[in-house]
UniProtKB/Swiss-Prot annotation:
Gene3D superfamilies the UniProt entry points to: Clavaminate synthase-like (3.60.130.10)
Gene Ontology MF: a single term: oxidoreductase activity
Pfam family, one: DIT1_PvcA
E.C. no: 1.-.-.-
Gene name in the database record: icsA
The entry's keywords: Oxidoreductase
Coiled-coil portions: none
Name by which UniProt lists this protein: Isocyanide synthase A
Similarity comment: Belongs to the isocyanide synthase family.
Purpose: Isocyanide synthase involved in the biosynthesis of isocyanides (or isonitriles), a class of microbial secondary metabolites. The presence of an isonitrile moiety within a compound imparts unique biological (cytotoxic, antibacterial, and antiprotozoal) and chemical (transition metal coordination) properties and enables synthetic and biochemical applications.
Enzyme kind, highest EC tier: oxidoreductase
Keyword Oxidoreductase: yes
InterPro entries: Isocyanide_synthase_DIT1 (IPR007817), TauD-like_sf (IPR042098), TauD/TfdA-like (IPR003819)
Protein source organism: Aspergillus fumigatus (strain ATCC MYA-4609 / CBS 101355 / FGSC A1100 / Af293) (Neosartorya fumigata)
Length: 602
């Protein structure tokens, strides 16, 4: 980005950050060359104008038409209404916009334009199904509290209908008017090979479209309607940034990944697939028609709607308890009593199952469980999980504001850096005299109070989500594997005082997979005088400027909303967290009381 003078202006800085976020969320197709760098100057110009005027950044995404129709006795989805797949995709889009709003105060919005009226007749989708899908999609976004999404239909966008349809009859009328426009004044000749993006869409249709007697004619009709639709979008939303869910070269429009990594390795959209929770608790988007129904069961939501697929496993069979196992966004899992059941006693929870599940998905949240003789039970259940790691203060730490015990910023209301517990927990090698970091494997939390109205979130960032994002924009995994980082924080009553050199990538002590290790640099400028101390971090053997740049990129990945689950505590919550697989942090809070107990287990 060109500098105005020696240093970038605040506007240039902000535009550069926004472009970095857009770049990070884009899909790089294996079938089409990625030419995002060619589009970046035009994007920079558009964003500079938007930011300079103090206007919100607006994106437009044609998508979410309806669930793919059944082909004979096969169906890629679980039904005709939104389910867990749409939930995750909407959360991803809202997180994308929220990331921009965090650095650009006027905010950011993704306008979702439903494709239903564009393709519904060609794919033989009843208006009633498309209308119900759209209405339920809006309800889902509202129930999730997603504030950066808007929903509109093409006719309303083009101004040919006065407002959004509220009834099926109004919707059918709007659909008719929209198709007349697309097949009339907006219709254009189309060549499947006219450019890279059209070729990619044409190739996609070769396998994605339902079987037809004349496939080429069917595909041509879809491409022609799509080209007219693109013209409608371009003419109706000139000040927006065009997003896409089709494979493209990322010029003129930016193809989005709608799911966190590694959820959708096959680039399946939510209306062409279903969420599958595998036996190891990992989450994938799959073509439901390819799933072995003897191995998987359909899980319904509280309304009885088919919601996701789950592989049959004793991991999800907690004897005597009727439970929901719900994937969290973008990582982790919540376990809670099914509606009409519970609360269950924490004393009765099988900690062997908890340990297995927590090693498969992190963090693991238990909500809706009671505990009677508090500390005695908490300590006893921790022992069932594994060997408790002791600290100078004992085994259970009461994490609340406490100025009488110096643990850096742990027992304050301050924000904390992203870290993993025990990085500064050390033992001295008897032979070499070297100080060795001995972090615990598990964290076990029990929330006692969470009355703060704002802030006080705990963020958990999973290596399973972060490592797939390593690459040219940050640093490739194999390069990072060769590097070490150096860190130091001053000694306090529990830890610190020794300079450490540690690898960025380690092998998980139980699963054997790669996991990321780091501590967010925390300079004195982020500390509260008299309350907390800085933590110094740099890449071993690198010049300071290059080290700072890499540390900034890695820190940005930890905060990426596709990587970090943002937990708002409720009194009574239990969290079991794989400390080797994740990092965590706390956001600052001002009012209210926040307290939980923490114990470390190996």
């Amino acid at each position: 980005m060109p500098y105005a003078g020696n240093l970038p202006t605040p506007t240039e800085n902000k535009v550069s950050q926004i472009i970095s976020i857009i770049s990070a969320y884009r899909h790089r197709s294996a079938a089409v060359p990625d030419r995002f760098s060619e589009f970046a100057p035009a994007l920079e110009k558009q964003l500079t104008e938007t930011v300079s005027k103090g206007e919100p950044v607006r994106f437009i995404l044609p998508s979410f038409p309806f669930k793919a129709p059944a082909e004979g006795d096969k169906r890629k989805t679980l039904g005709s209404l939104p389910d867990k797949a749409e939930e995750i995709a909407l959360q991803t889009l809202d997180a994308f916009a929220d990331s921009i709003a965090e650095i650009h105060q006027p905010g950011a919005t993704v306008v979702i334009v439903s494709d239903a009226s564009v393709y519904g007749d060609l794919l033989k989708i009843p208006d009633a199904d498309a209308f119900a899908y759209h209405q339920e999609l809006k309800k889902l976004a509202a129930s999730l509290g997603l504030t950066h999404l808007e929903f509109v239909r093409p006719g309303t966008l083009a101004g040919i209908v006065p407002e959004e349809a509220k009834t099926l009859e109004e919707y059918s009328d709007h659909v008719s008017k929209t198709r007349n426009l697309l097949d009339g004044t907006l219709a254009q000749a189309v060549d499947p090979n006219e450019d890279e993006n059209m070729r990619a869409t044409s190739k996609h249709y070769d396998t994605a479209l339902p079987q037809a007697e004349d496939h080429e004619a069917f595909k041509a009709a879809m491409l022609k309607r799509g080209k007219a639709y693109a013209k409608l979008i371009a003419s109706s939303a000139e000040s927006t940034i065009r997003l896409s869910i089709h494979e493209s070269n990322n010029v003129g429009k930016i193809t989005m990944n709608l799911f966190p990594p590694p959820t959708s390795p096959d680039f399946i959209t939510p209306w062409h697939g279903a969420v599958a929770v595998l036996a190891d608790a990992s989450v994938r988007i799959v073509d439901a028609s390819t799933v072995d129904r003897d191995r998987f069961e359909v899980i319904t939501n509280h309304e009885g709607r088919p919601w996701l697929l789950r592989e049959k496993s004793d991991l999800f069979d907690w004897f005597g308890m009727e439970l929901d196992f719900e994937p969290l966004f973008p990582c982790g899992m919540q376990v809670r009593p099914k509606e009409g059941y519970g609360p269950y006693r924490f004393e009765d929870v099988n900690m062997k199952l908890v340990r297995r599940l927590a090693l498969s998905t992190a963090p693991l949240l238990l909500r809706g469980f009671t505990m009677q003789v508090e500390k005695e039970v908490f300590r006893s259940k921790a022992r069932e999980l594994g060997e408790i790691q002791m600290w100078p203060f004992g085994d259970i730490l009461e994490v609340r504001e406490n100025a009488d015990f110096n643990m850096n910023n742990v027992l304050t209301r301050e924000a904390m850096p992203f870290h993993y517990d025990g990085v500064f927990k050390t033992v001295q090698d008897e032979k070499t005299g070297e100080w060795i970091s001995v972090p615990p494997l598990f964290q076990m939390f029990r929330n006692r109070a969470a009355s703060q109205s704002k802030g006080g979130l705990t963020l958990f960032a999973s290596s399973r989500n972060l490592i797939p994002l390593l690459g040219p924009d940050s640093i490739p995994l194999e390069e990072l594997r060769k590097l070490q980082w150096e860190t130091f924080t001053a000694a306090n009553e529990a830890f610190g005082g020794h300079k450490l050199q540690l690898p960025f990538i380690i092998t998980h002590p139980e699963s054997g997979v790669d996991t990321f290790r780091f501590h967010e640099p925390w300079p004195e400028s982020k500390c509260v005088p008299g309350s907390s101390e800085p933590t110094l971090v740099r890449v071993v053997g690198w010049p300071l400027a290059e080290s700072d740049a890499l540390c900034e990129k890695l820190t940005r990945l930890l905060y990426d909303r596709r990587v970090a689950y943002r937990h708002q505590w409720k009194a009574g919550d239990f969290i079991f967290n794989d400390n080797a697989m994740t990092h965590h942090t706390r956001t600052a809070f001002e009012d209210g009381h926040r307290e939980h107990w923490r114990v470390h287990v190996n």
